[in-house]
């Protein structure tokens, strides 16, 4: 993700250019699952639960920029405002205060509210979910980490060798 704009449930607008680092999730290969979650971020926080999220992202496998608009449904926002029946690792009241977004080939996007402790994540079906690319880009036109073309680094060439595109069930 190269840029994100968030309008929270309190109608405060946020813009994020310095995005939280997301470590590789080795257990998320070929399909989504409800257990994996990235460690909590440090920079991309909002005062109230997010309502509308717009973000720009590069798909190296697709060799293109995507622009995704999503709106969380009221039920997800309500869940994030209430405390969980589960406690956090310190034994204190915990809240569903973290949203995780999965990105996959062909511009596919999935959303979860992170579970508490060993509880599985909660899949969210957005009220609005629209992903565009190419000449349909509005805000994300020219926003990329790959201005000189998409190249594969590290273990990626070996990982994708002999796989059929799009790889996996997303």
What residue ranges belong to the model's regions?
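Extracellular interdomain linker/stem segments of modular secreted and single-pass surface proteins
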Residues: 74-79
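Intrinsically disordered, low-complexity linker/terminal regions across diverse proteins
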Residues: 160-168
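Beta-strand secondary-structure signal
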Residues: 52-56, 69, 100
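Compositionally biased low-complexity segments at domain edges in trafficked proteins
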Residues: 80-155, 169
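Edge beta-strands of extracellular beta-sandwich domains
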Residues: 64-71
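Tryptophan-paired
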Residues: 12-61
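A structural detector for beta-sheet-dominated domains
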Residues: 2-8, 15-19, 71-73, 102-104, ...
């Amino acid at each position: 993700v190269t840029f994100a704009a968030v309008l929270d449930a309190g109608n405060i607008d946020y813009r994020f250019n310095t995005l939280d680092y997301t470590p590789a999730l080795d257990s998320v290969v070929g399909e989504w699952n409800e257990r994996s979650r990235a460690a909590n971020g440090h920079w991309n926080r909002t005062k109230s639960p997010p309502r509308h999220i717009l973000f720009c992202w590069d798909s190296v496998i697709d060799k293109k920029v995507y622009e995704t608009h999503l709106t969380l449904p009221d039920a997800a926002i309500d869940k994030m405002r209430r405390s969980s029946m589960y406690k956090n690792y310190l034994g204190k009241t915990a809240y569903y205060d973290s949203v995780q977004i999965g990105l996959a080939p062909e511009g596919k996007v999935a959303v979860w509210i992170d579970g508490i402790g060993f509880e599985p994540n909660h899949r969210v079906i957005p009220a609005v979910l629209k992903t565009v690319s190419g000449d349909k880009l509005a805000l994300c036109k020219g926003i990329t980490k790959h201005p000189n073309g998409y190249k594969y680094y590290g273990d990626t060439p070996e990982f994708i060798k002999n796989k059929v595109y799009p790889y996996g069930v997303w």
